[in-house]
């Protein structure tokens, strides 16, 4: 499957799962009309467009992602949103970096992809206005459902998939955040949302799209899929529902401190 198809597949699945969790989290982050926001790791832009709606025409959202195919899909999908721009970028290279440009930097399920988190926090700090804040939603461990899916549906690729992730404990994230100069406003765990898939093909597509194509859908035989769904889903037939109960992800909101950072 091509990278463009992967990006489109990501758009189709993220429109539900990640947007649902992201919207819930944004109630705490509280973007305001007129805000300038950086959406760091925007994917195909579903939450970016929602942020643009929240800040209104007097505000602006700059959305960046290192995956150019996802950026192209985002640009084509949200052409009518005039206060939103999509650009290729990363945690170490984004518009306005180091220039105190943004009121909020939003980062939704991106932290586990970034090896150098200390650099990320320093870059975010220097890119916020004096009254700015960051709003991060992240996983500090491999979610249980994902771990089962990778090991049972794609055992041939499990090591490659694990090596893609750079999880950090919540306490470790908080420590790096404070070291960069932030004051933590809120840091808490949230129950992971349930996952529902219309059929087996949507399960294959979901894990393929969310691993940048490393998860191979062609290795998911009907026997593997049936066994997986029988073990973990609720009910006997499609749509397949997998409960998030007992699993969690983390959220962090932190404000730019007026105090100087020693050694910063």
Predicted segment positions?
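Conserved class I S-adenosyl-L-methionine
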Residues: 1-35, 46-50, 69-73, 77, 135-157, ...
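Class I SAM-dependent methyltransferase SAM/SAH-binding core
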Residues: 38-40, 44-94
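A short acidic, Gly/Pro-enriched loop at the edge of an enzyme's catalytic core
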Residues: 96-105
